From Swiss-Prot:
Keywords attached to this entry: Cytoplasm, Gluconeogenesis, Glycolysis, Isomerase
Pathway, per record: Carbohydrate biosynthesis; gluconeogenesis; Carbohydrate degradation; glycolysis; D-glyceraldehyde 3-phosphate and glycerone phosphate from D-glucose: step 2/4
Name assigned to this protein: Glucose-6-phosphate isomerase
Native organism: Methylocella silvestris (strain DSM 15510 / CIP 108128 / LMG 27833 / NCIMB 13906 / BL2)
Compartment(s) where it occurs, according to its Swiss-Prot or TrEMBL record: Cytoplasm
Primary localisation category: cytoplasm
Record keyword Isomerase present: yes
């Protein structure tokens, strides 16, 4: 790639978007009654409205020029062709193959992986159906009632998010639980009201060495052995890993082990055997519908022209907000309570992928990369942080997600929810100027002095950008589509920023230091002389508190 072309394209975009006298978003709507028609994109029943951003037709043209200069299209093909796009680990990033229900050839390192992916998926779904039906039972002969998933990062965030999102589709006789934190309270709280005699534990760790996961799994194994006897372990555990020797030593039967491949990154692994807990919960048909939703977007992303390509448009607008306007964070606000964990899922997906400071050549980048991604469901967020969104000194772009139809039966609740979603995006864009506030206060009978004192506090500047994703209802297929949209958006941004979106070396140093600290923390007589003063002081303070000082 010729980075000078990217630099030139960005310079043209930056000069135009930040030109003197650039109109506000509300003025763009006033000048163009057809603005919504021009600045939204559709895929099937999914609508992406990006009209409430600070861009016009020329801005969009320049953004598309930037994408082409960065060679988004050939890089996209390299991704789908299984090229080693994860250059630091010399691997493909072929999670799309996991949702390739068509069986079309997909290659990693020159090997067509479609058949082996299908075989592993079929093994997983057959097991899931057997657990659901009661063909596979607990040691006492009873049907399983509870599924506990041990994992962390992508092995937890994905399944936990999806299980919450698709809760109406989970079998009535099953409850799904997710234990991630090495804090023993996580496991203890989960098991407090969970009957161990009808609980199936799933240990998700590719290497079967992940500290947090294996600590929790070992605790669970001892818990089962103590309450049900050691012979029950084989009936109550299964594993998602590639390390058969370690799994056998742990006590998991070989026919209850499910694998995946090194070209599947953790944050993309929900589509793989890591989704076993979800598959047990929702069943074969719904799990396949979830995969089909991701496959739908893969096809759209690969085939749609850039100007109508939703992940590409999402990425370009994100680059505009991050690199031209300097917005440091991105809020994700689903007006859909069952998507409560979606912001946290996207937080890992985005920040672990693109939270990088060196380019593909190893040189320091001279521009910002991933924003801080955060969010909570609406309307809850309106009573927490929306004050900052509307009147704070930082402008925070927002992604709103909302269904046209409720998954619950009560239409009244959904009408209120939907109205609030639209109202918030409208308020962020339009604002309320001082003149309008003053007129409103005057109509309420306030004196001129009272108006002068109060009005500045009630001004909304507006001109705060947002996108809205509208879909018919939150179904398994819809969820698959939403996840894949963000996956590909993040990939495109990584291409433009010339970074590796598929490694995560930033998680390693803390883990290494924790391994060195663990013996010191566990032995009150261990020396702290080699530690920095702060860490040593904290260790000594903890020792004193444990001793009752």
């Amino acid at each position: 790639m010729d980075r000078s072309k990217v630099a030139n394209a960005f310079a043209a975009l930056d000069a135009y978007a930040r030109r003197s006298g650039a109109p506000k978003i509300a003025d763009l709507f006033a000048a163009d009654p057809q603005r919504f028609d021009r600045f939204h994109a559709r895929f099937d029943d999914l609508l992406y409205d990006f009209s409430k951003h600070r861009l016009d037709a020329e801005t969009l043209r320049l953004l598309l020029d930037l994408g082409r200069a960065a060679e988004v299209e050939p890089r996209r093909e390299a991704l789908f062709e299984g090229d080693p796009v994860n250059i630091t680990e010399r691997r493909a990033a072929l999670h799309m193959a996991l949702r390739n229900l068509s069986g079309a050839p997909m290659r990693a390192a020159g090997e067509d992986v479609a058949a082996m992916v299908e075989a592993e998926r079929e093994k997983l779904l057959a097991f899931a159906e057997a657990v659901r039906s009661g063909a596979i039972r607990a040691a006492n002969g009873a049907r399983f009632t509870d599924i506990v998933n041990f994992g962390i990062g992508g092995s937890d965030l994905g399944p936990a998010m999806a299980a919450r999102a698709l809760s109406p589709f989970i079998a009535d006789h099953l409850r799904l639980h997710f234990v991630a934190n090495v804090d023993g309270a996580d496991f203890a709280d989960t098991m407090r009201n969970t009957p161990v005699e009808t609980t199936l534990f799933i240990v998700c760790s590719k290497t079967f060495t992940t500290l947090e996961t294996m600590t929790n799994a070992a605790t669970a194994r001892a818990y089962v052995a103590e309450r049900l006897g050691p012979d029950a372990i084989a009936s109550h555990f299964c594993a998602v890993s590639t390390q058969l020797d370690r799994i056998a030593a742990f006590g998991v039967r070989s026919d209850r082990v499910f694998g995946f491949w090194d070209w599947v990154g953790g944050r993309y692994s929900i589509w793989s055997s890591i989704g076993l807990s979800l598959a047990i919960g929702v069943g074969r048909d719904n799990f396949e519908a979830f995969l089909r939703g991701g496959e739908d977007i893969d096809r759209h992303f690969r085939e749609a022209p850039l100007e109508r390509n939703i992940p590409v448009l999402m990425a370009l607008i994100g680059v505009l907000n991050r690199n031209v306007f300097g917005y440091a964070t991105q809020a994700v606000i689903p007006y859909d309570q069952r998507l409560a964990r979606f912001p946290a899922y996207l937080q890992q997906l985005d920040m672990e992928s693109n939270g990088k400071s060196v380019d593909l050549s190893g040189a320091r980048v001279a521009y910002e990369t991933s924003p801080v991604v955060w969010g909570e469901p609406g309307t809850n967020g309106q009573h927490a942080f929306f004050q900052l969104l509307h009147q704070g000194t930082e402008i925070v772009p927002v992604d709103f997600l909302v269904a046209a139809k409720p998954t619950a039966a009560d239409e009244t609740h959904h009408r209120i929810l939907f109205a609030n979603c639209l109202a918030q995006s409208q308020a962020l864009m339009q604002g309320r100027p001082l003149e309008a506030v003053s007129a409103q206060l005057a109509a309420q009978g306030l004196s001129p002095d009272a108006i002068a004192a109060l009005a500045p506090h009630k001004v909304f500047d507006g001109d705060r950008p947002s996108s809205t994703f509208l879909y018919t209802a939150l179904t398994p297929r819809t969820l698959g589509r939403l996840i894949a949209l963000y996956e590909h958006k993040i990939f495109v941004q990584g291409v433009i920023w010339d970074i590796n979106s598929f490694d995560q070396w930033g998680v390693e140093l803390g883990k290494e230091l924790a391994q060195k600290l663990a013996p010191i923390v566990g032995d009150d007589s261990a020396s702290t002389e080699a530690l920095d003063a702060s860490t040593a002081g904290l260790v000594q303070a903890a020792r004193a508190r444990r001793a009752g000082a």
